[in-house]
Amino acid sequence: MAAQRTYLAIDLKSFYASVECVDRHLDPLTTNLVVADASRTEKTICLAVSPSLKAYKIPGRARLFEAVQRVREVNAQRLQTAIRQNKAVRGEDGKYHFASTSFDANALNTDPALGLSYIVAPPRMQRYLDVSTQIYKTYLKYVSPADIYPYSIDEVFIDVTGYLPYYHMSAHDLAMTMVREVLYNTGITATAGIGTNLYLAKLAMDIVAKHIPADKDGVRIAELDEQSYRYLLWNHRPLTDFWMTGPGTVKRLEAHGIYTMGDLARFSIHGEDRLYEVFGVDAEILIDHAWGYEPCGMEQIKSYKPSTNSISEGQVLTCPYPNDKAKLIVREMAEILMFRLTEKKLVTESITLEIGYDRENVDKG
């Protein structure tokens, strides 16, 4: 039997927004900020929302106008509170106003006379890549590149099995040491999950850590093994919180009366064949994950190569385009794809075009 391994999953908290706050010498945990290109109208997507602004129920991938609308709603409630407490200011027009506004969560929490404001920071992708590289180099001070898998610009998996006896540390202590150094060097807070496999490390970070108190720096570290996973998460809902379980999969599971991972595990005991009928080879992954198993380790995910290649090109237009202009955009994107195929020495047998329509114009017919 193979020795049990220990994995870390580390996620940089609201990474793009945190970088923008730090570069402005502001606290990423208490500064209200969105990363969005306001020049592309309020329909542009927010690439990141700071934690304090998320606390007002603004999702991380909201459209800018949705953030504007939610802030307006919050300020309407705050103004009523300020009026009741005789802290609002009556202007020359006879209407009540806030005495001032603030984008700092601490100030807003202590003074109801302040209106909620926020910073709109234009995205700077090269800057985010530079900071991500700096943080990756911090991890390399503790582990070998062979034991790190960058999952995204702000998230990594690390196999720390062999390092725990070397450093005479627990997984929690090693995770905290690395996260603390990232915070010290960059000002960016991270969340970590510890698991006996990659899947459990990811869930510890994504789900369990969100429900434990943060330390004074906003750091959260959670741990899972197979037994604690079943105890803590078999009844957790919604299923979409679980890694690699999307809305389409969840809809098909619910059609079979499966609403939790515990339901799925129990169903698999006698209904395994039915799961394979519905999900094909993906049923194996679903069943493994329901029980807290994950057979792939660091070596397998680093050596994985897809059986097929795909490349894509996309644009978010700043306003509705008529047919002739849209045709020009599509032609330009097709030419870019052609050049990229040539560079990679690839050919294709399939081209897919997806077009999203402006909601207002669709409603108008």
Language-model features: locations:
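Gly/Gly-Pro- and Ser/Thr-rich, intrinsically disordered tail segments characteristic of DNA damage-repair
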Residues: M1-D288, C296-M298
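DNA-contacting surface of Y-family translesion DNA polymerases
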Residues: A9, D241, T249-G365
